């Protein structure tokens, strides 16, 4: 290894060592609403004005903005003639971190700090599903305000963005669909968006009784309580969004068998919306996020995971599906059409 390669390797090692700082700074920027302020202002904003807006001294804020600019979360612009103040503008990345975009989801990832939110050497060595004593608990989840606001908002923003991607890039897939059941559909936000976009669909939101009991009425959506391990309501299409990555292969096969029983053999299909990992870990611009999500699932579910094409093919075949087609919806997740 030459000196240049060695220096580059050491620099990369330093970057890994300080990797947590990036998450921390971006989390703080979201809490201070910096992405929203830059977006709503609509033009470059001075450091002094931004300092007044967020309540952080200019000398400290300058260092934070310098860090954010290095990572593309803001853009330093030229100062007006006669001014010496720093000016910052939004970027495509900062727009993605606003409250109406992925801000809440990124905030959740940065907020978690308990044993269940990280990978440990001991956890990787264990072959047993961890109990509460081993896994520990994140005090954040004992805080009702956190659970209600941060966690709920994070899950909602993720679902909203993915559903929008489905509507925009898979609209033709809903032609001729008379009924659709969303398995694990929670309070029906995703299904409500789909029914609004494709009003000819009769939506069935299927979840556990304790979830359905708290759901508010939605136009075009019927709420049904039950367990996906026992049965699934009959429909033209069964949808599983962010569901199967929580479960082991055997559990996924059981769930998919119940879904297969619920659709017409000749015309029905199961829609799976989850990430697909490339065999070599490479891929498009979402590749790193998918790998990170896979490791997260290993930490918080033990047997859950993001699957490769080969792994998806295996569980679909074992569940009795004769073929499947992968659709690119230009998101972290892909859409898999599975046919009985």
UniProtKB/Swiss-Prot annotation:
Q: EC number(s) per UniProt?
A: 2.1.1.-, 2.1.1.232
Show the SUPFAM superfamilies listed in the entry. Answer: S-adenosyl-L-methionine-dependent methyltransferases, Winged helix' DNA-binding domain
Q: Which principal EC class is assigned to this enzyme? A: transferase
The record's listing under InterPro entries reads:
COMT-like, O_MeTrfase_dom, Plant_O-MeTrfase_dimerisation, SAM-dependent_MTases_sf, WH-like_DNA-bd_sf, WH_DNA-bd_sf
Q: Which UniProt keywords apply?
A: Methyltransferase, S-adenosyl-L-methionine, Transferase
Q: Which reaction does it catalyse?
A: scutellarein 4'-methyl ether + S-adenosyl-L-methionine = ladanein + S-adenosyl-L-homocysteine; acacetin + S-adenosyl-L-methionine = apigenin 4',7-dimethyl ether + S-adenosyl-L-homocysteine; diosmetin + S-adenosyl-L-methionine = luteolin 4',7-dimethyl ether + S-adenosyl-L-homocysteine; chrysoeriol + S-adenosyl-L-methionine = velutin + S-adenosyl-L-homocysteine
Query: What Gene Ontology terms for biological process does this UniProt record contain?
Result: methylation
Q: Which residues form the active site?
A: 245
Tissue-level expression: Expressed in leaves.
So where does this one cross the membrane? Answer: none
Tell me which residues bind S-adenosyl-L-methionine: 207
Q: Which domain of life is it from?
A: Eukaryota
In alphabetical order, the GO MF annotations are: O-methyltransferase activity; protein dimerization activity
**PANTHER family assigned to the protein according to its UniProt record, in alphabetical order:** O-METHYLTRANSFERASE
| Subunit structure of this chain's protein | Homodimer.
Q: Which family does it belong to?
A: Belongs to the class I-like SAM-binding methyltransferase superfamily. Cation-independent O-methyltransferase family.
Q: What does this protein do?
A: Flavonoid 7-O-methyltransferase involved in the biosynthesis of polymethoxylated flavonoids natural products such as nevadensin and salvigenin, aroma compounds which contribute to the flavor of sweet basil, and exhibit pharmacological activities such as anti-allergic, anti-oxidant, antibacterial, anti-proliferative, and anti-inflammatory effects.
Q: What is this protein called?
A: Flavonoid 7-O-methyltransferase 2
User: What is the organism of origin for this protein?
Assistant: Ocimum basilicum
């Amino acid at each position: 290894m030459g000196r240049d390669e060695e220096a580059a390797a050491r620099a990369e090692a330093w970057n890994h060592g300080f990797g947590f700082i990036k998450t921390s700074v971006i989390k703080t920027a979201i809490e201070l609403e910096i992405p929203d302020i830059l977006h709503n202002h609509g033009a470059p904003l001075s450091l002094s004005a931004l300092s007044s807006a967020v309540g952080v001294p200019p000398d400290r804020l300058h260092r934070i903005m310098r860090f954010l600019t290095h990572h593309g979360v803001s853009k330093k612009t030229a100062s007006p003639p006669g001014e010496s103040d720093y000016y910052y503008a939004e970027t495509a990345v900062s727009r993605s971190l606003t409250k109406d975009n992925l801000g809440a989801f990124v905030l959740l990832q940065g907020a978690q700090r308990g044993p269940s939110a990280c990978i440990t050497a001991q956890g990787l060595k264990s072959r047993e599903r961890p109990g509460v004593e081993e896994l520990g608990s994140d005090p954040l989840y004992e805080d009702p305000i956190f659970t209600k606001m941060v966690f709920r908002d994070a899950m909602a923003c993720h679902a909203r963005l993915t559903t929008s991607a489905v509507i925009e890039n898979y609209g033709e897939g809903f032609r001729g669909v008379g009924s659709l059941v969303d398995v694990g559909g929670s309070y029906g936000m995703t299904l409500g968006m789909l029914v609004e976009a494709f009003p000819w669909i009769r939506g069935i939101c299927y979840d556990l009784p304790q979830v359905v009991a708290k759901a508010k009425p939605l136009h075009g959506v019927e709420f049904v309580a039950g367990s996906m391990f026992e049965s699934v309501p009959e429909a033209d299409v069964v949808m599983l969004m962010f569901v199967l990555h929580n479960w082991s292969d055997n559990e996924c096969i059981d769930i998919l068998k119940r879904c297969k029983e619920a659709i017409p053999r000749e015309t029905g299909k199961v829609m799976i919306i989850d990430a697909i990992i490339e065999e070599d870990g490479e891929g498009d611009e979402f590749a790193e996020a998918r790998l990170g999500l896979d490791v997260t699932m290993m930490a918080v579910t033990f047997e859950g995971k993001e699957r490769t094409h080969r792994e998806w093919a295996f569980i679909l075949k074992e569940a009795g599906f004769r073929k499947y087609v992968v659709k690119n919806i230009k998101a972290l997740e892909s859409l898999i059409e599975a046919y009985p």
